[in-house]
Amino acid sequence: MASQNVVFAIDVDYRPEGTQNTTNAYQDHLKQWILRVLLSLGHRYGLEKVRWGYKFFNSRTVKSATLITRGSDFKELQEKVFSDFEEELHVKFTTEGKSPRSQEKSHKLKPSPACCVQNALKEILLDFQWDRPDLTSPTKVTLRPRRSSRSGRNIPLQDCDMLSVDKNVLFVVSECPRSKAELEDYLSMRREDSRHHKDINEQMLPKGLIDMLMQRNVVLHWADSGVFKADHVAKDYTGIETLMERLGLVGGQVVPMLSPCLPLMDQHPKMNSLLALGVDAFPIDSTNSYLHLSKRMQQQLFPPLGASFSWIADGTKRSCNVTLEPVSYRQRSLRAPVDVLLKGVLQSLDILSLSHSAIETWILQCPDAELGQEAFQHLKQLSTGGHAMLAEVSEGDVVCSAVLSVLSSCTAQITVLQPLLAQEGQLLPADLVSLDTTDISGDLPDVVSSVLSVMYDIMEEDDCSDHEKMPLVPDWANQELKQQSSSRSNGMVEGWFPLSDQSGISCHLMESMRLLHAAPEEKEKGEEYSDTQQEITSSLSEFYQSSTAGSSGSLRSKKRGTQCTPVRQKMKTMSRSLQMLNFARLNVKAQKTQGDSGSAGSGKGTEKGGKKSSGDRTKPGLLHFSSEEELLSHLGLTYQKAVENRTMSVPSQVQDLLSVVKSFLKSNTEASLLNLVQKHVLKSCQSIRQHYGNSSDDESKIRECQLQAVLRLELCKQTEQEDEEVVEQRVEDVADMLRNISRSKDAVYLSRFMQEEVLPLYMNSIPKVLADVYHSLGTQLPEALVAVLPSDFFSDESLAKDSVSVSLSSFSATQSNISSVGDHLEELRNRSAKKRRQSMITRHKSMTEAPQALRQIEMPRKSTRLAKPKLCVPIEKTAVEQPPLPKQPVQEVTKVRRNLFNQVTVSPSKKSKMPRSQSVSAVEGIKKRKRSDVDNDDRHTLLTKKVSETPLHKQVSSRLLHRQRTGRKSGESDVCIIEESPIKPAADLRRSPRIKSLTRRHSSVFYSSSQPRSRNLDRVVSSSQLSHSEGKGKFSVSSVRSPVRLLFGATQSPGRLRHTTVSSLEDQASKGLPLRCSSFENQNKTPQKLRSDALASAVGCRTPQSPRTPNRTVGDNGMALRGSPFQSPAAKSIVVETPMKSPLKGILKTPIKKSLLDCVSPNGAWLRSPGCKTPKKCVTWSPSPRKPVPENQVNVPDSPVFAKRHSPRLVTPGKNSSPEEKIVFKTPDKVPQRKSKTSPEIILRRLEIPVNIDPETCKSITRSGKIRTLSLPYKTSKGSDEFLPQSESGSFPFCNSPLKPNIQKTIQSPIPTHRMCTRSGNTPVKESCSPSSNSQGITGTSPSPRKSLSSAVAKSSPSPSFGPSRSGVGNQNNSSISNVEKHTDDDKIIVQNKANDEKAEEASSSDSQQFDCSEFSITTDDESIDISEAAVVKTQLVGGIKMNIAFSRKPSKSDVFEFEGKQTTSTGTPLTRSYGFRQTPDRRQREAEARLGYSSGKPKISTPRTRRTPACGKQSSPQPLTYEVEMEMQASGLPKLKLRRTDSFNAGDLPSSATKGMTSHLVHRNKTNLKAPQIDSPLVQSSRHPGCISPSLCSRATPAKGTPGKGVQTYICQSITPTHHPTSSQSPLASPLTPSPQSRGWPTPENLNSWPRKKRARIETCGNKEQVIKGVPLLEKTGVIEDPELEGIFRIQGVEELKESLSTPISQRKLGLRSSQVMDHQGSPEGMDWTETMAQMCDAKDSTKTEQFAWMGRKVDTPKVKKQVSASGIFALTQSPLLYKKSAVIKEATQFSGSKSELEISPLCQPRRRRTPSRTYSRKKLLD
């Protein structure tokens, strides 16, 4: 509370005229008045809060040097300070012998008194520090809040006390000008031309001075020291009224200091000097009270009473209404009606006689101005000469005499005389002068006698035989007053008596009181009572004496009185925090010594036992309960009182409550204390919240929560033998109550409550319970509690000495398997009992937002002591696994900081069985999760085996984690594990091909789920295989989220992986959990892959119109769970009708029900369309984990794009991507890619196009996507590419642009951009932006595949869209969508072929993850559609893993795909066709290629039945393509693919955009690895096709760089880095390309540096950087990977993508790179650079495209960020699971309404800008 600052400005020039005695009396009274003011403030606010000061000034003379005040600052209220003041006051008044007034004439130039007063006030305001705390007193609190506005000053007295806490007070002690004449004298205005009234106000108190007072928050009062003369009656009160008006502006008043109540007669002989001044006439306390109280309070204390005043004038009786206000609030109120009758005038009245009588004084005022003026005029005439008047006051039937005196022109004072006066001989003098002389003599005695008679009657009625009236003040008070040197009047006594206890009673008085009670009276009730009274009196007397003698009244003396011990002395030197801790520790020790019994009683008994403890007091009542009902009612009342009574401590109330129950139970043993309390007293946290609801009574709620919490702790204390589960439940309840308190109040309040009330009582008795409560709250254990905890409470794992702030590690390692909570905790205690306690647990940051990078993983390790190493219990959901054999070896659960490159040296067989590591989020509660492999305590002896990567202080005890989880547990299910990270969906983590032992993945393309395979083969397959999601219709390999699996493929058998991951995914999917973009959810968490099954099935089942399906399909195919044991071929066959069934779903812990297609856009539905339905098995055999090809990849072109896969791109919505795009991205790429035939990329592209996924989004998706599907970007038919541009403009991401064609085109289309590897590892779905022309072969609907996406879109717009997009984008983009769909059919086929080719590519070169970007990795139905059969020809495990796989593509069904949207360009097949593509020979060929894992060329194979765009080019020959893939695991760990086309290939197909794009893509990516087929070979063409190249770009950085959990996963390498980027735009490679790790400040891993690097391809592009970034998905922030972990890393655009982006119009880019790619592929000869191809396609399709590309003609150097990477490295990256597929530019395919491509393409959606078609891409051959 702020200090009370009081300053007295004392005018030393004012001295009452008279003798020296008069002056001395004035000084004495002034000192007394000041002291009384200070004491009243001290009584009100505390003596230590009052600071005061004083200043002397001259108002009538020139300022004297002697008036310099010694102290100009505030002083404390101490005796010495006041003594100094007295001395100085005496000096000031005695320095000048004369009265100042006698010297007035000598000073002709003296200033006016007003100026002197104002100057003094200004000096005081400036000298004193009003707004600062007292620095000399540390106990004084803080600064006082200032009032900045004046408005508060205008009514300061209305609602608050005048001397409120935040005010400073300034008193001017001087004579107040009363009349107008005095006012003029005060202002020195003696001339007749006096200034205007306004000027008078300004001179009285200038505005500047008022402002100063307000700024300093000072209230100004004027203490009038003037004395009334007996014969002085002011004519007017202008002066005092003016002054009061001005003071009211600053909240001040004019108060009398010496003014008497009644005028005194100067001639009275008995007057002494004090009485002459009227000192006793007006009690000082009344003045103080008047200042302290507001007007409202004064009216309440002194209520006005209505009365009638009558007088006789000129023989007529006149009357008027008046009000009577009591002078003292203690006097009785008069009974109405009250009549005052003026009787006459009193002469020579001795006023002193009235002061000794019992009187009651009232102030009489007349509210009526006219009547009042007349009445008071009459009174003035009578009072001339200072005579008082006699009046009669009749109240009811009683008539009393009264003395009336006039105070002012409107105020009079009436003093009612008591009847006792006459009997005591104090009758009024007889010399009364009456107005009517005849009546005076006879009337007066009658009046007196009547009054006396009435009073006698009253006294008799009251049985008062004694006529003496009891004095108002007790005898002891009078005795005390007599001890004083001077006499006191009644007024003084009345004011002093009530405050005597504060002002202090002398020792003499206390001794007298003690003597009074020395002999107990017999009237007392008994001896005991008498003794008690004596003891109290004695104690009081001793206390007063000791306090008076021992202290001088100052606070400091009390401090000095405290005992100073060495401990206290030492603690004074400590910091405040240390002092608090030490006090707590000392209190704990004190409690230990006292024992628990001391807390039961509330107080100590006196020595004589007179005072009983609270327990004793309650016992008698407790024993009287006759029934339990009475007890319960009593408990209810007691409980309610405890809630309402907040003065008592909570523990004492709880103990009293329980003591009542205990005493009752002594006689009723059948009732149990616990049961009774549990049943009738305890309340749940929920019930309390419901009870108070929205009530504002937070205090009661908090109080009740405190009672409930302490009650449970008390129960734990009194019943320590309870079952541990019961105790745990109580702990949780207590934590809930405390959380309620924290929410209602704040954490500081809760901490204080725990420290002050809970810890001291229960710290010694139940420290473990308290520690558990703190753990559950997630707060730090107090040091005092840690000190008393048993040594075995903490485990070495959980604590480190001097542990720093808790990281997420304290929560992140959750117990995955617990046989039982009790057993587990007991085992932990027993295990750690032998270990030294190291330190306290710090606050867990999981309660806050701690970085996920600090997450720990629990990695089951084989027990080195136990024999059966083969039995390994994955920490994934145990429900999926079969319970281990009883004798199964126990696994050691070790907290391991995730390190992607940390391998445990275990034999390959063991590794294959090793379950993927599980990152558990401590936030999810797994309270009673049991280990399936642990049956008894012996099984889980968790010895502390630490992995070197995890420092001791980073490890957390399972016990603590369990406590924290149970405390935060909100879900009902016991098992709530989030596998990779709390947020990200399950998806395959990227694996590094360099770790061969971990590379094992099962390719769904090659094996059916039921088909067994050898372990070696599994291992080989895992290294190059796509995500399981692709492989299995119902299962997604993406379920495996371990970094190892993510990087290197599944290590477990497909069956197991499927069970574990699928079940979890299916569970989540079944729960309807929405798909999440893994990259978005948690930077550290690997995104989960969408189930490919769901997508594939959706794709297959749905007509192309339902674009949603593709979303899922894409995601499912694209993602394979990293550690999923099973990547069974069944996944391939995942043509799940229901997208939700995809196995990946089951695997995904995160809810990812919908296939990416669904999420992405309405187009997803058409992806699921029949085309998708028939999933062709994609040979996304590449090591990329994400690329598992769904078994059944739908050949139907319409669905394939989506079905192909939701590449990771989809998973992570691009930042720029539209909401729909984001939706697509959100779909975790990890969702197993549907077996849908469409390659994931195709799906992604489709998805992306409709969704307008930003390249960033795609990137992030790719990163997040765990499945590294190597699907090459499917080159969409040119038509579809065209569609893509439309979709770009359109809101529908997928449907509008032919995602499929783009996908088929491979990375050229924006899909590559999106393909950027997302964290999850899934290649983001690439928008089917690849040149429409390329895909057009597939989508025959688009008129000219060659045309840019925009043109293609425009053309395709005439054709009906596939179907309304879910988001409605489809409607917007219907035209484009329809084109897209038609193209998509073609695209799907192409994509499928492409996907197969891509997969083949991926398989052939697991080195490069180009296919991450490429559609191949997409395991969507489209991808798998084209592969009719695949066989492992040769396997070699010596000197590197080598496999020869022969696969052939089925012709894709172009006819199935139907476009709902109007495709302007589509002239071919009717829209009503089934969604599947026609099985044209070229389509079949492409399908075969897709199955084989490589694209046979541009996926031109079969155009969908929808009409092809004229520019589409030739359809691929019906002949299915057959390829032989040879995969070789190099020593560097990078797989190497060699594709060999074994079956006939239609050379004519090469030009087809899709085929060509696929081929060029494959060739570009894998050129070194691929053995280029004939020009007619689809692979060759596709390799030449620019779109094919982009995937390689996609694989720029190594994922190996960082652990998935940590911030950055770098892509292994950038396969192709164009030397030049579009000028303003980063080269497609530039933005999209992931900057080399070094650019971000991370050193490139050695293994990356050691990889062979491909020289940067020179890309001559012109264009602006912004466009590239925005327009090209990859370049766009697509280039930047969304995943926070990969922050700063840009996805590398595939060469194809670059070409596409450069050559493709912005709008096309927006749609997707793929469309551009497709067109380029068709247009360009096989050997032509992708840019050239693009240019040709653009020329053929649309001149506008070339124009659009023309602006990209300038050369731009590739940003230095990109590092050249060897060809093999690039290839490995693209193929490697480490790389995520670039997301197709899904969102780019927003609706393109016109044939024009819109420049306003969402960055994600836009394909990468390609340089002008004329530019050539200088591509170096990949090096082995």
Curated annotation (Swiss-Prot):
Null allele phenotype: Embryonic lethality, due to impaired S-phase progression and disruption of the S/M checkpoint, leading to premature mitotic entry and mitotic catastrophe.
Q: Which domain of life is it from?
A: Eukaryota
Q: Biased composition, Basic residues: where in the chain?
A: 1807-1824
**InterPro entries assigned to the protein according to its UniProt record, in alphabetical order:** Treslin (IPR026153), Treslin_M (IPR032746), Treslin_N (IPR053919), Treslin_STD (IPR053920)
Principal place where this protein is found?
Answer: nucleus
**What subcellular compartments does it reside in?**
Nucleus
Q: Which keywords has UniProt assigned to this entry?
A: Cell cycle, DNA damage, DNA repair, Nucleus
Oligomeric state and interaction partners are given as: Interacts with topbp1 (via BRCT domains); interaction takes place in a cdk2-dependent manner. Component of the replisome complex.
Q: Which purpose does this protein serve, as stated in its record?
A: Regulator of DNA replication and S/M and G2/M checkpoints. Regulates the triggering of DNA replication initiation via its interaction with topbp1 by participating in cdk2-mediated loading of cdc45l onto replication origins. Required for the transition from pre-replication complex (pre-RC) to pre-initiation complex (pre-IC). Required to prevent mitotic entry after treatment with ionizing radiation.
Supply the name of the protein: Treslin
- According to its UniProt entry, this protein's organism is Danio rerio
This protein's encoding gene: ticrr
